[in-house]
Design a protein with these regions (language model features):
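Hydrophobic/aromatic beta-strand elements that line small-molecule binding cavities or substrate pockets
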Residues: 40, 68, 92-98, 119-127
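Hydrophobic ligand-binding cavity/cleft-lining segments
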Residues: 29-77
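A short, structured loop/turn motif at beta-sheet edges
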Residues: 48, 73, 98-102, 124-134
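Intrinsic-disorder-associated, low-complexity terminal segments enriched in Asp/Asn/His/Tyr and depleted
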Residues: 12, 25-26
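Glycine-rich portal/gate segments that line the openings of hydrophobic small-molecule binding cavities
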Residues: 62-114, 165-174
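Beta-strand/loop substructures that line and gate deep hydrophobic ligand-binding cavities in soluble
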Residues: 110-162, 169
Length: 174
């Protein structure tokens, strides 16, 4: 159970919930915008401080998605580019990742306006006790008015699952 409702258990032990279809901000454009929100979480048998170190590493950011490279880095902020295939079209997507003082990692997509008006997320680290940390991955975004939520739901769920697997493997290995 999360603070937002029941989560379903997955075969890999992670939990997942998705809330979609709610208009977030009608001021951003005409018509109802497609608001999507996804989250996933898992527990790692390491203290938060160890996980925060791994999460802050460039190698972790580049392993979240295949074909990702860091194109600029300044302090706790990194910009990446990733080659992806979404909705049948090959393209390059750019994200900005920012490491927070508490060890969390915020990210946002640099939107080109073709599909997304906004896409933001975070990887939060919540200590369960001295030896366990809950890792929560959240993404939410608003699609353009002419992009129905159902066309983006499956690719987003797939990307979140891929990101969760890669992050979990990296955190458990380190």
């Amino acid at each position: 159970m999360s603070s937002r409702g029941r989560l379903s258990e997955r075969t890999d032990g992670s939990q997942h919930g998705a809330w979609v279809g709610c208009p977030r901000d009608h001021r951003a454009g005409s018509g109802t915008l497609g608001f999507v929100k996804f989250d996933n979480e898992f527990i790692v048998r390491k203290p938060k401080s160890e996980i925060a170190e791994v999460l802050a590493a460039d190698a972790t950011v580049t392993q979240l998605f295949p074909d990702t490279e860091i194109v600029s880095s300044k302090g706790a902020t990194r910009e990446t580019k990733t080659r992806v295939s979404a909705l049948g079209v090959e393209s390059i997507v750019r994200f900005v990742f920012h490491t927070e003082p508490d060890g969390s990692l915020r990210f946002e997509k640099i939107c080109d306006g073709r599909v997304w008006r906004s896409l933001d997320g975070a990887i939060r680290l919540l200590p369960v006790n001295d030896k366990l940390t809950r890792v929560v991955i959240e993404m939410e975004g608003t699609t353009k008015a002419l992009v129905p939520e159902f066309t983006i739901r499956a690719p987003m769920q797939s990307q979140l699952s891929q990101m969760t697997r890669a992050l979990r493997e990296r955190l458990e290995r380190a």
